[in-house]
From Swiss-Prot:
InterPro entries registered for this protein in UniProt: Aminotrans_3 (IPR005814), Aminotrans_3_PPA_site (IPR049704), L-lysine_6-transaminase (IPR017657), PyrdxlP-dep_Trfase (IPR015424), PyrdxlP-dep_Trfase_major (IPR015421), PyrdxlP-dep_Trfase_small (IPR015422)
Protein name as annotated: L-lysine-epsilon aminotransferase
Positions contributing to L-lysine binding: 170
N6-(pyridoxal phosphate)lysine PTM positions: 300
Gene that produces this protein: lat
EC number: 2.6.1.36
Effect seen on changing residue 330 to A/S: Loss of activity. Cannot bind pyridoxal 5'-phosphate
Something else known: Was identified as a high-confidence drug target. Various compounds targeting the LAT enzyme have been identified as potential anti-tuberculosis agents.
One biological process term in Gene Ontology: antibiotic biosynthetic process
Domain notes: Contains a Glu-243 'switch' that allows the enzyme to change substrate preferences in the two half-reactions. The unique substrate L-lysine is recognized specifically when Glu-243 maintains a salt bridge with Arg-422. On the other hand, the binding of the common C5 substrates L-glutamate and alpha-ketoglutarate is enabled when Glu-243 switches away and unshields Arg-422.
Keyword Transferase: yes
Pfam families noted in UniProt: Aminotran_3
Obligatory cofactor(s): pyridoxal 5'-phosphate
Record field: catalytic activity: L-lysine + 2-oxoglutarate = (S)-2-amino-6-oxohexanoate + L-glutamate
Length: 449
């Protein structure tokens, strides 16, 4: 009989909550929130500090990655799910090579709850940046083969058209697209890919002014295509720029970009890593824009990251989704994450959480509008789609001070862009929790001003 090997604590002091930052600081940069997460006592929209016991109202959800909040009852009370999760966690198979019932159940559920019939191809990987990275690889391969089929040099098709203010990740290709903060990209080698203005909606602009902004961005896009003939593989954009400042675009702009992509034989890619999985009130934000992408990159709330693809991709028969090993990774996503993701998606489906995000998003937006009416010089441009809501302040210093004041009031929100506070509550957030967050903002604003 095999001996049971038990976990043995190393000699020295135990790692208690009050030592977490000390222990981590010996080996890594510790610049996160000043909290030690209590994985047991945290629940729903509240994070509990394991050191102090203080409860923080969570309006950031681990940068929009937690769909149901902490310890959702539908998962905590499901013993069958616990057994499945433990079974998956005991091993980490290479999903790209060896398939399992757990993986098949996840893929089936993903396709049912989040799938787009026009985008039938799925590829899974660990990390949102790698999701975008593989979307780009799919586009590069497609453009090269499309060129070759039309008598054009297949070495062309190496460039990506993208927007100013974009955040698409920190990996190799994506570093050439991300341009929110110099700290993220400075001193790393990057490709000189075409970047155009982002004609996002903002206060004070009427329809003609918005149309003029869009026309200029479209002029820049056309110029990029014309000066790089056959070399732009795709246009990639976030439907709403999150890290860049919760910047919203009119559907007309993306519709025009779809037409340009078709005219110049480039793929349209939406990066829905932050906007996807119901945050905006639909499975994907692009579904509210009446624009059909060829590829969608996803992550965060989906737990497992990856891409959905179809439409023009299938005009090339030997695309990366049909040829073995063109896209691959050892893990092909994490099986433990797949089990958790499947159960989360089942809960989202059963409880109608996309529809709930619409209704509670309207409520949150209305409460932000009230703040703007009461503090018109400070609370600027309240905006949102579903629960993806935000507002701006006059200066970066004002924004940063408000976030500090909210932290002191045990409310966690996120900065974005130069002057924006963004709300990223779980899909399960209640109106009472929204009220509590708004009350904290209301009490903090006089201190900021």
């Amino acid at each position: 009989m095999a001996a049971v090997v038990k976990s043995v604590a190393l000699a020295g002091r135990p790692t208690t909550p009050d030592r977490v930052h000390e222990v981590l600081g010996r080996s890594m940069l510790v610049d996160g929130l000043d909290i030690v997460l209590d994985l047991t006592r945290s629940g729903g929209s509240y994070l509990v500090d394991a050191i102090t016991g203080r409860r923080y109202l969570d309006m950031f959800t681990f940068v929009a990655s937690s769909a149901l909040g902490m310890n959702p009852p539908a998962l905590v009370d499901d013993r069958e799910f616990h057994a499945e999760l433990m079974q998956a966690a005991l091993n980490k198979p290479s999903n790209s090579d060896v398939y399992s019932v757990a993986m098949a159940r996840f893929v089936e559920t993903f396709a049912r709850v989040l799938g787009d019939p026009a985008l039938p191809h799925l590829f899974f990987v660990e990390g949102g940046a790698l999701a975008v990275e593989n979307a780009l690889k799919a586009a590069f391969d497609w453009k090269s083969r499309h060129n070759q089929a039309h008598g054009i040099d297949p070495a062309l098709g190496t460039q990506v058209l993208h927007l100013r203010g974009a955040f698409h990740g920190r990996s190799g290709y994506t570093l050439s697209l991300t341009n929110t903060k110099p700290t993220i990209t400075a001193r790393f080698p990057k490709f000189d890919w075409p970047r155009i203005d982002a004609p996002y909606m903002r206060p004070g602009l009427d329809e003609p002014a918005m149309a003029a902004l869009e026309a200029e961005a479209l002029r820049q896009a056309r110029a990029a295509f014309e000066t790089r003939p056959h070399d732009i593989a795709c246009f990639v954009a976030e439907p709403i720029q999150g890290e860049g400042g919760d910047r919203h675009f009119r559907p007309e702009f993306f519709a025009a970009m779809r037409e340009l992509c078709d005219e110049f034989d480039a793929l349209l890619i939406f990066d829905e890593v932050q906007t996807g999985c119901g945050l905006t009130g639909t499975a994907w934000a692009y579904q509210q824009l009446d624009v059909a992408p060829d590829i969608v990159a996803f992550g965060k709330k989906t737990q497992v990251c990856g891409v959905m693809a179809g439409r023009r991709v299938d005009e090339v028969a030997d695309n990366v989704f049909a040829v073995p090993s063109r896209l691959n990774s050892t893990w092909g996503g994490n099986l433990t994450d797949m089990v958790r993701a499947r159960r989360i998606l089942e809960v989202i489906e059963a409880e109608g959480l996309f529809e709930r995000a619409v209704q509670h998003g309207k409520y949150l937006r209305a409460r932000l509008d009230e703040l703007a009416a009461d503090f018109p010089a400070v609370v600027l441009d309240p905006r949102g789609r579903g629960l993806m809501c935000a507002f701006s302040l006059p200066t970066t210093a004002d924004r940063d001070e408000l976030i500090r004041q909210l932290w002191q009031r045990a409310v966690i929100v996120l900065p974005a862009g130069a002057d924006t506070v963004r709300f990223r509550p779980p899909l399960t957030v209640s109106t009472a929790e929204i009220d509590a967050a708004i009350a904290a903002v209301r009490s903090a604003l006089p201190v900021v001003t």
